[in-house]
Amino acid sequence: MNEQRFFRFLRERIGLDVESVGAPMVERALRQRCVAAGAMDLDDYWLRLQQSADEQQALIEAVIVPETWFFRYPESFTALASLAHKRLAQLAGARPLRLLSLPCSTGEEPYSLAMALFDAGMAPGAFLVDGMDISPSSVAKAGQAVYGRNAFRGSELGFRERYFDALDEGHRLHERVRQQVSLRVGNVLDPALASRDGLYDFVFCRNLLIYFDVPTQQRVFEVLKRLLHPQGVLFIGPAEGSLLARMGMRPLGIAQSFAYVRHEGDSAPLAAAPAQTAKRAFTTLPAPVYPQPSVPLPRSRRVLPVAARPARAREHSHEGASELLAGIARLANAGASEQARSECQRYLSQYPPSAQVYYWLGLLSDTEGDAQQALSHYRKALYLEPQHPEALVHLAALLAAQGDLAGARRLQERAARAGRESER
C-alpha cells in the first residue's frame, strides 16, 4: 500500500505501532497534512516530508492525540506520597527527590505529581519534577498551564481550589506549582536520553508501552530502566503490568497504584507502607453515584420496583446505596481488595446493578492480574452505562495489551467522543 512507507516512518521516529491506534486514523492525518502542505498526492507529500523536519514534526503532531487529566488513577498519587516520604528520609538531605513524567503530554500529570507532594507536606526544595514529550505543541500548552473542563474529572476537585485561579478561558495553575516542573521536548527512543538525564526516584510512564510493538517495548523499557534509580519506582498504566512482569519487574504491592520495582536480588526497593497507615497526598476519588440503570435483574435478585415503594423506603435505599458505594471506594483506595470485592458483591445482592460497582470489580481484577474477569466486569459496566469514562479507558488498554487493537481503537474513539461531549 502507498501508506506503508508513512507507517514505517512513524514506527522509526516515535515507535508507533499503527495498528494500536488504527490505520484509518493515521490515514486521516496524512490527508490533512497533504492539504495543509499543498501536496498534489501522497507521492508528492512523501518528498516534502523527507525534505522538511518541520513537516515531519507536523505529521507526528497530527497523529498524536493526547488524552489525559489531573490525578488520573488517583491511587498512584496516594502511593507516591507515602513512598516519597520514605525515599526522602533515605536520602537524608543529600539531594532532592527526582521525578519524571514521560510522556508528559499537556502537563496534567507532572503538575499532579507536584501538587500531590505539596499536599503531602513537602517543601519546594525537597523535590524536582521533569516532564518530557515528543510533541512541541503539547509541551508549549503545558508551559502555558491554562486548562479547560476536560482536564478536571471526577467529583473530588478540591485541588483546583487550592492550586488554580479561575479565568474566562479556564483555570490557570499557580506559579508555585509551575516552578517545580521543568518541561522539554524529547523522544523516549533517543539512545542518549538515559545518560543525559541521570537517575530518577520515581518515573511515571503510563499507557505508552501498549502503543508499541514488542521490539520497541523492549527498547523503551531499557531506557526507562536506565533512567530509574535501583531503588526507584516505575508507575505504569493498568494494562501494562504483564509487559513489565516479562521484563524483570514486580508489582510493589500497593493496590491500584500500578507501581513496579526491579526484581533483582541486589536492589533494595522501597518497602510499601501498609495500606491502612499510608499518608494520603489528597482525598481519593469517591465512587460517583450514577443513575440507576433500567435493566431487569435476575430473578434471584429481583427487588421491589422503586415506584411501588413508600417514599421513605426509596430515600433510605438511595442513601444506603450511596454509602455502600463510598465504602467500596474507601476500601479499594486503601488497598483492602478482598473487602472491597466483598462489598461490591453485597451491593449487587441488595441494589439494582451499578456500572460503578462493576467498574470497581474490573479494576480490582485488573490489579490482581485476572484479565478475563476484568474484561467481563468492564463490559458489564459499559452495558449499564455505555459512556462510563473510566471503564472505556481501562477496557481499551486491556484489549490493546491482549492484541485486540481494533476493539481497543473503537473504545478509545468512544472515550474521546465522551470527553468532547462533557466539555459542551
Swiss-Prot record:
CDD domains documented for this protein: AdoMet_MTases (cd02440)
Gene Ontology annotations of biological process type: methylation
Ranges in a coiled coil: none
CheR-type methyltransferase domain span: 1-263
Residues annotated as binding S-adenosyl-L-methionine: T68, R72, E109, D133, N187, V188, R206, N207
InterPro entries xrefs: Bact_Chemotaxis_MeTrfase, CheR_C, CheR_MeTrfase, CheR_N, SAM-dependent_MTases_sf, TPR-like_helical_dom_sf, TPR_rpt
EC category: transferase
Enzyme Commission code: 2.1.1.-
Sample GO molecular function, one term: S-adenosylmethionine-dependent methyltransferase activity
Extent of the TPR repeats: 355-388
One Pfam family of this chain: CheR
Alphabetized UniProt keyword annotations: Methyltransferase, S-adenosyl-L-methionine, TPR repeat, Transferase
Source superkingdom: Bacteria
Gene inactivation effect: Mutants show a dramatic reduction in biofilm formation.
General function of this protein: Involved in biofilm formation.
Quaternary structure and interacting proteins, as annotated: Monomer. The TPR repeat does not mediate self-association.
Protein name: Probable biofilm formation methyltransferase WspC
Natural source organism: Pseudomonas putida (strain ATCC 47054 / DSM 6125 / CFBP 8728 / NCIMB 11950 / KT2440)
